[in-house]
C-alpha cells in the first residue's frame, strides 16, 4: 500500500520505502528463499514473500498506487491483458515489439482485435476508442499507451488521453518503462494500470528481469493478483531484492543519465552525419545518414558504447532497431541509445569516432 499523504521527494522515497520497521530488524529487506511457510497455509506463489512486498511497497510509494511484481515485464503485460480481458485493444502503431507480438498472437487466436493508432494524434486516438466502445461496449475496450514510445520516442498527451478514456469508462494501460517512476506518474492522470519492465531503469544494472504493475482500482488489483497466481508469473527472490536495491539509486541514476543524454543529443542535432536526433530522459534515438549500412558501421565501430538490445543500465548501450522483424517499419538508419552515467565527454568521444567511420 502507498502512503497517500506522503509529501517526501522521490529521491527520499526511493531510499527509505520498503525497509523493515521493527526493532532489531536488518536495515535492508532480506532475500527470502521460500516457497512454503509453517502453519499459516501461505504459499509463495499465492501469498508472496516479504522480499516482494518490500519492492512493491517502494515502487507503489513512488508511483502512488498498489504495486504487484512479476517475473518479467512481458509477464506483467500478459497479466494485464488476462485481467482486463478486452475485446479491442487500441495500441500505438510504434511501440515495444514484445507487446505488439503478444497482441498479434492473441488476435491470430481470435482473443482480441488490435487497432493501431498514431499515439501523438490525440484526436485520432480518442476517435478510435470511442468507435471501439460503440462497437463492443466500453468495458471491453483497453487503451494501451506507451509514452515515450520505443524506439522513436514519440510522446503522447498522457493526461488528455486518460481524461478522455475515463470520460468514456474505458480502461487505460500506460507502459511507463522508458519514463520510469521518476519521469512520470500516470496514475495521477487517471490511468487504470501502469506497467514497468523493472529489468530496465528500476533495476538499473542489467542483471535481473522483473515486471511491475500499479493501479488504484481495487477490483483491477485483485484481478491482477489473480492473474499472477494462475499464470505463475512470480518474481524470483534475488530478482526482487536486486530490483529494490537498484531502486534506491534510481533518481540519481536517472538524473545523471538524462543530463548526459541531453548533451549528447544537443551535439548530435548539429552533427553532419546525423539526420535527426531526439531524447526523452536518458533514452536517445537518432538517424544516421546513409541508412542501415552507415548505422551498422557506427554500432560496430564504437568501443566503449556497447551494442546491446536492452536498456536502462548504468552503461551506455545502442543498437539499430530496424534489423528486428518486429521493428521493420522503423527508419533503417535509426539507432536507439540508452545513455548511461559515464563521463559525458567519454561517451561523446566514442560516438564521435564511430560517426566518423
Segments predicted by a language model, with ranges:
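A short, N-terminal amphipathic alpha-helix
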Residues: 58-63, 267
Amino acid at each position: 500500500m502507498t502512503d497517500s499523504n506522503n509529501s517526501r521527494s522521490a529521491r527520499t522515497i526511493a531510499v527509505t520505502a520498503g525497509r523493515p520497521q521493527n526493532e532489531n530488524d536488518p536495515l535492508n529487506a532480506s532475500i527470502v528463499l521460500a516457497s512454503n511457510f509453517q502453519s499459516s497455509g501461505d504459499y509463495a506463489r499465492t501469498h508472496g514473500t516479504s522480499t516482494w512486498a518490500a519492492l512493491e511497497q517502494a515502487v507503489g510509494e513512488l508511483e502512488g498506487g498498489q504495486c504487484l511484481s512479476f517475473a518479467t515485464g512481458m509477464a506483467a503485460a500478459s497479466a494485464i491483458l488476462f485481467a482486463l480481458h478486452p475485446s479491442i485493444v487500441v495500441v500505438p502503431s510504434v511501440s515495444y515489439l514484445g507487446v505488439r507480438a503478444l497482441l498479434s498472437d492473441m488476435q491470430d487466436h481470435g482473443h482480441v482485435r488490435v487497432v493501431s493508432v498514431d499515439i501523438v494524434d490525440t484526436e485520432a486516438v480518442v476517435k478510435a476508442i470511442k468507435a471501439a466502445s460503440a462497437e463492443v461496449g466500453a468495458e471491453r475496450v483497453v487503451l494501451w499507451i506507451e509514452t515515450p514510445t520505443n524506439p522513436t520516442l514519440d510522446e503522447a498527451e498522457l493526461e488528455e488521453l486518460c481524461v478522455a478514456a475515463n470520460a468514456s469508462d474505458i480502461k487505460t494501460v500506460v507502459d511507463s518503462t522508458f519514463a520510469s517512476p521518476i519521469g512520470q506518474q500516470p496514475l495521477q492522470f487517471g490511468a487504470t494500470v501502469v506497467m514497468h519492465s523493472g529489468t530496465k531503469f528500476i533495476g538499473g544494472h542489467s542483471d535481473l528481469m522483473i515486471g511491475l504493475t500499479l493501479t488504484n482500482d481495487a477490483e483491477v488489483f485483485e484481478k491482477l493478483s489473480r492473474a499472477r497466481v494462475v499464470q505463475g508469473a512470480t518474481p524470483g527472490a534475488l530478482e526482487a531484492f536486486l530490483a529494490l536495491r537498484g531502486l534506491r539509486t534510481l533518481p540519481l541514476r536517472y538524473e545523471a543519465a538524462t543530463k548526459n543524454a541531453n548533451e549528447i543529443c544537443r551535439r548530435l542535432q548539429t552533427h553532419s552525419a546525423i539526420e535527426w536526433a531526439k531524447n526523452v530522459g536518458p533514452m536517445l534515438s537518432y538517424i544516421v545518414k546513409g541508412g542501415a549500412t552507415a548505422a551498422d558501421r557506427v554500432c560496430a565501430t564504437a568501443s566503449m558504447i556497447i551494442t546491446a538490445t536492452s536498456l536502462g543500465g548504468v552503461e551506455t548501450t545502442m543498437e539499430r532497431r530496424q534489423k528486428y522483424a518486429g521493428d521493420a517499419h522503423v527508419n533503417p538508419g535509426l539507432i536507439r541509445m540508452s545513455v548511461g552515467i559515464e563521463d559525458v565527454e567519454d561517451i561523446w568521444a566514442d560516438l564521435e569516432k564511430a560517426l566518423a567511420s
